[in-house]
């Protein structure tokens, strides 16, 4: 009886120790299967850091540049060249719209004259009841736009530049950004102090700051850099969006802020600006290592957009 009671107490003690170990020690992969990808990213960072002895403040930007160059840069170049091809094809389709409008207007005028002649010889009837084929100017514009889009879609498919492929870059870039961010966040759940600093960096007085917490010595440094680079990216992309809407098609028109395209692009820019404010607030409370990844990613995007706009400009 005493032996059975002792075995039961030993089993309870071993269970308590194992539960404490799972809580405060290394995370058991079986307990968080849905976040195993983030843990793998954190373990990869830790393995590379211990094997190469590269400081964290160098390893994270270097990894960012490598991933963006190998993964997202080819998609960005591919998308930029595809958009340029789409713009060239739009120039071919654009003259179709006024031609279709003229044809529909001519048919409508002919039918309306016939209807007016019948009403003058006989009893008066409303135009809508006399001839259902008479189109209003709004209907003519709508039919012309639909026909133009139909021909544009066929032309894009013929040259293998459909519009749905423009969503491939966000589908690759956003999951990559989220995965690396959450992996670094998992890495900084415990205290992370750099031990491989070079001598010149130690002389600046930053040889022992905690990378898993915000930068206490200069708390506004990371938010200012993240916010500034994010705003520059948004405004640069916005300028390219507005400048390439009609002028890239070789058509000079007066700016109309009331059009649906202009309103949609303005809404996208406003949401992006709001996202910059959110990132600025998050970086003020995020670990410095995570803010460093955001800074390097935004900087890479800014330089990439400037270079691509110089090599493959939207306006020709």
UniProtKB/Swiss-Prot annotation:
Belongs to the OXA1/ALB3/YidC family. PANTHER family: CYTOCHROME C OXIDASE ASSEMBLY PROTEIN COX18, MITOCHONDRIAL, OXA1. This is Cytochrome c oxidase assembly protein COX18, mitochondrial. Present with 468 molecules/cell in log phase SD medium. GO terms for molecular function: membrane insertase activity. It is a multi-pass membrane protein. Keywords: Membrane, Mitochondrion, Mitochondrion inner membrane, Transit peptide, Transmembrane, Transmembrane helix. Required for the insertion of integral membrane proteins into the mitochondrial inner membrane. Essential for the activity and assembly of cytochrome c oxidase. Plays a central role in the translocation and export of the C-terminal part of the COX2 protein into the mitochondrial intermembrane space. One of its GO terms (biological process) is mitochondrial cytochrome c oxidase assembly. GO terms for cellular component: mitochondrial inner membrane. Residues 185-213, 296-316 are mitochondrial matrix. Its main location: mitochondrion. Interacts with PNT1 and MSS2. It comes from the Eukaryota. It comes from Saccharomyces cerevisiae (strain ATCC 204508 / S288c). The chain crosses the membrane at residues 164-184, 214-234, 275-295. Residues 235-274 are mitochondrial intermembrane. It is found in: Mitochondrion inner membrane.
């Amino acid at each position: 009886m005493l032996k059975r009671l002792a075995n039961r107490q030993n089993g309870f003690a071993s269970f308590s120790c194992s539960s404490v170990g799972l809580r405060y020690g290394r995370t058991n992969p079986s307990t968080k299967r849905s976040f195993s990808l983030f843990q793998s990213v954190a373990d990869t960072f830790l393995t590379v850091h211990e094997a190469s002895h590269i400081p964290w403040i160098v390893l994270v930007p270097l990894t960012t540049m490598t991933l963006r160059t190998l993964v997202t840069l080819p998609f960005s170049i591919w998308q930029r060249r595809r958009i340029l091809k789409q713009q060239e094809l739009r120039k071919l389709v654009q003259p179709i719209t006024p031609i279709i409008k003229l044809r529909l207007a001519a048919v409508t005028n002919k039918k309306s004259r016939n209807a007016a002649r019948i009403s003058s010889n006989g009893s008066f009837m409303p135009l809508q009841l006399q001839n259902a084929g008479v189109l209003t100017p709004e209907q003519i514009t709508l039919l012309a736009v639909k026909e133009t889009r139909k021909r544009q879609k066929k032309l894009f498919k013929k040259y293998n530049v459909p519009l749905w492929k423009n969503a491939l870059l966000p589908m690759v870039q956003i999951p990559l950004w989220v995965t690396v961010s959450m992996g670094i966040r998992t890495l900084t759940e415990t205290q992370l102090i750099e031990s491989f600093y070079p001598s010149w960096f130690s002389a600046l007085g930053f040889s022992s700051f905690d990378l898993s917490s915000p930068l206490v010595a200069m708390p506004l440094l990371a938010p200012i850099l993240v916010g500034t680079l994010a705003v520059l990216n948004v405004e640069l992309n916005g300028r390219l969006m507005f400048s390439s809407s009609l002028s890239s098609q070789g058509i000079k028109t007066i700016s109309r802020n009331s059009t649906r395209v202009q309103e949609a692009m303005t809404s996208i820019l406003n949401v992006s600006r709001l996202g910059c404010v959110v990132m600025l607030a998050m970086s003020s409370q995020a670990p410095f290592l995570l803010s460093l990844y955001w800074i390097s990613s935004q900087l890479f995007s800014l330089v990439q957009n400037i270079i691509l706009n110089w090599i493959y400009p939207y306006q020709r």
